[in-house]
Every structure is written in structure tokens, then in C-alpha cells.
């Protein structure tokens, strides 16, 4: 049976930067309060770019990076909890924009774990069918579901999209997954139905029960436990020692979660790649944005061993072991 490898990455973030200092003018907070509790310095907020646009731009970059044509794609999966429409799906809209006429397209909703779930679904579909190449996108426009009057949540989130292209290959690539869900604790991170035009500068607000709501302490506890379980499970399946792993690319939610996880695993914090200081929490987009940033910076070399790990609303979690092949 063929192996599956990552052959290209791409990303898009809005140009509009919202700093901690700006947020301190609209809610009772400060740069020091946000920075010391989250590690976030700024985030990108959409000014007209919708989810489809950001997803499409990240897809175009990934296609170029993979040196393929859009009509080479057999599958497009978009992970998002902030679609522009219920139908057509974001994936079908991306298909239209990039001209991927041969692709099967659908969306999934698994919050911050969505990109990992998308990778696992795509790998299964590629291995068990005639399909050869898949585009997986994580894209979020979280600013439209953030309560800009709640200092505990509005400081955390940003907008953006990231993408990866998978292909059947003879090389060693994507090896093992570990994923799961715990709906019994779903009430700790929720969001209701979306409505348009919710920005930090406008009075057009969502109903309060339709914003992102989070029990921070419970999510912190869940995240550290899920990260530790996932990484240890992947180590067991692959027989990798953490010393062999070049990087762990986790969901970019909070620097403290990453620091606590590193301590539990008895490994250095620097093994965890972090860019949340620039982008905040972009949910399903955070891992592929980080992966593309690392690829562009030349931080990953062929045959490097990496682990991707995510956690989020649902509650959901998942991870994957990859031997880098670009």
C-alpha cells in the first residue's frame, strides 16, 4: 500500500493587526495582563476577508509550493467552525475559486482539532481509493463570533487560514494518528449560531449566547491532559523517543499550556514551535499556519520527525506523527 506524504503547504493571514494595547482601549485589560497569561502580543483580524477568501489564498500557496495544478487534486477538505454559508460548503467554494474540477469536496467541524481530523480522514480516503492527492485546509474567521466586550475571550482569538497538500508516495511520510472526542465536557467551550458584522469597532453585536464562551480552567486542564496523552500515544505507536523528534507543532492556544505540557513530558519548551504571539488562537487554522511558516523559514528538513497535536471545542483532540518529505 502507498504511503502518504505532505508535499506542499500554504497560509494566509489578514494584514490588519490588532495589538494588546488596542484591546486595552475597548475592554478592561492591558498588554502586560494578556502577554503574561497567554503569550499573545497581537492577532490578525479580518477587514472584509471572509473564510472562503482566506481558505482560497492558503490553497493557492499550497498548490504552488507542491508544484502541482489545481486539477490534480482529488479531494478537498476544509476544517472550519466559521463558514460563510451553510451551503455550498467552504470546500466547494474553494474548488470553484481555484478550478479544482476533479476534487471531491466537503467541510468538517471539529474546532481547533479540525485540521488533524482532516488529515486523518484524507489519509484514510487516499489509502483506500483511486484518489492520489488531497488538499486539507483549516480556515477561521473567529472575529465574527468573539464577544468584544469580554476581556477573557476577545484577547485570545485571531483570523487566518492554513493548508497542506497530501499525496500518495513511496517515501515514508504520515505514520500514525491518535485522536478522540469527549462530548461529555462540551459545555466548557461553546458558540451559538453565527450572524454577520461583528467587529471590535461596530455596535452590531451577536446575541450574548451566540459568542464563544469558555471555561478557561477546565479547558486548560483538558488541553494539558489531551496533549500529553496524544504525544505519549504517538510515541508508543512509532517507538520514537522525544529526542528524535525535531519539533512538536501544537495548536496555538496559550503559551502556558505548551509550557505545562513540556514539563509533563520532561522535554524542553523549545521543542514546541510557537507563533501565537503574532496570531493568537486561530482554531483549525493554527497548526497549518505554523507548519507553513516553518516550511517557509526552512526549519524543516527532509526526514525530520515531527508531531502535530491539537485540542479544542467538542471537546476534541488529535495528533499525528510525520516524517517530513519536502
Swiss-Prot record:
* GO CC term (a single one): cytoplasm
Q: Which domain of life is it from?
A: Bacteria
Q: Which pathway, per its entry?
A: Lipid metabolism; fatty acid biosynthesis
Q: Which UniProt keywords apply?
A: Acyltransferase, Cytoplasm, Fatty acid biosynthesis, Fatty acid metabolism, Lipid biosynthesis, Lipid metabolism, Multifunctional enzyme, Transferase
Q: Name one GO biological process term.
A: secondary metabolite biosynthetic process
Region feature ACP-binding, mapped onto this chain = 252-256
**Which EC number(s) does the record attach to this protein?**
2.3.1.180
Q: Where in the cell is it found?
A: Cytoplasm
**If you read the UniProt record, what top EC class would you report for this enzyme, in one word?**
transferase
Disulfide pairings: none
Pfam families given in the database record? ACP_syn_III (PF08545), ACP_syn_III_C (PF08541)
What are the protein's GO molecular function terms?
Answer: 3-oxoacyl-[acyl-carrier-protein] synthase activity; beta-ketoacyl-acyl-carrier-protein synthase III activity
The chemistry this enzyme catalyses reads: malonyl-[ACP] + acetyl-CoA + H(+) = 3-oxobutanoyl-[ACP] + CO2 + CoA
Name the catalytic site residues: 112, 251, 281
Similarity annotation: Belongs to the thiolase-like superfamily. FabH family.
HAMAP family to which the protein is assigned, alphabetical: FabH
Q: How does it assemble?
A: Homodimer.
What exactly does this protein do?
Catalyzes the condensation reaction of fatty acid synthesis by the addition to an acyl acceptor of two carbons from malonyl-ACP. Catalyzes the first condensation reaction which initiates fatty acid synthesis and may therefore play a role in governing the total rate of fatty acid production. Possesses both acetoacetyl-ACP synthase and acetyl transacylase activities. Its substrate specificity determines the biosynthesis of branched-chain and/or straight-chain of fatty acids.
Domain commentary: The last Arg residue of the ACP-binding site is essential for the weak association between ACP/AcpP and FabH.
Descriptive protein name? Beta-ketoacyl-[acyl-carrier-protein] synthase III
What is the protein's species of origin?
Answer: Clostridium botulinum (strain Langeland / NCTC 10281 / Type F)
Tell me the gene name.
Answer: fabH
Amino acid at each position: 500500500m502507498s504511503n502518504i506524504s505532505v508535499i506542499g503547504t500554504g497560509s494566509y493571514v489578514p494584514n490588519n493587526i490588532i495589538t494588546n494595547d488596542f484591546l486595552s482601549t475597548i475592554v478592561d485589560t492591558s498588554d502586560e495582563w494578556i502577554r503574561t497569561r497567554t503569550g499573545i502580543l497581537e492577532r490578525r483580524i479580518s477587514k472584509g476577508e471572509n473564510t472562503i477568501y482566506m481558505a482560497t489564498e492558503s490553497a493557492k500557496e499550497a498548490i504552488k509550493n507542491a508544484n502541482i495544478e489545481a486539477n490534480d487534486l482529488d479531494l478537498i477538505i476544509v476544517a472550519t467552525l466559521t463558514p460563510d454559508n451553510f451551503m455550498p460548503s467552504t470546500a466547494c467554494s474553494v474548488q470553484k475559486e481555484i478550478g479544482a474540477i476533479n476534487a471531491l469536496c466537503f467541510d468538517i467541524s471539529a474546532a481547533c482539532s479540525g485540521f488533524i481530523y482532516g488529515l486523518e480522514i484524507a489519509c484514510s480516503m487516499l489509502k483506500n481509493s483511486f484518489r492520489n492527492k488531497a488538499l486539507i485546509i483549516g480556515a477561521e474567521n473567529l472575529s465574527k463570533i468573539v464577544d468584544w466586550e469580554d476581556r477573557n475571550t476577545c484577547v485570545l482569538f485571531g483570523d487566518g487560514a492554513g493548508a497542506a497538500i497530501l499525496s500518495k508516495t513511496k517515501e515514508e511520510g504520515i505514520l500514525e494518528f491518535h485522536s478522540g472526542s469527549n462530548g461529555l465536557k462540551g459545555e466548557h467551550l461553546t458558540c451559538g449560531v453565527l450572524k454577520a458584522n461583528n467587529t471590535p469597532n461596530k455596535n452590531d453585536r451577536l446575541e450574548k449566547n451566540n459568542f464563544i464562551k469558555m471555561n478557561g480552567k477546565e479547558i486548560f486542564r483538558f488541553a494539558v491532559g489531551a496533549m500529553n496523552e496524544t504525544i505519549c500515544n504517538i510515541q508508543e505507536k512509532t517507538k520514537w523517543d522525544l529526542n528524535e523528534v525535531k519539533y512538536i507543532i501544537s495548536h496555538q492556544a496559550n503559551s502556558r499550556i505548551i509550557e505545562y505540557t513540556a514539563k509533563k513530558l520532561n522535554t524542553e519548551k523549545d521543542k514546541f514551535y510557537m507563533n501565537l504571539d503574532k496570531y493568537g488562537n486561530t482554531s483549525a487554522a493554527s497548526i497549518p499556519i505554523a507548519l507553513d511558516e516553518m516550511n517557509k523559514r526552512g526549519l524543516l528538513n527532509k526526514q525530520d520527525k515531527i508531531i502535530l497535536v491539537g485540542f479544542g471545542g467538542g471537546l476534541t483532540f488529535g495528533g499525528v506523527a510525520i516524517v517530513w518529505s519536502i
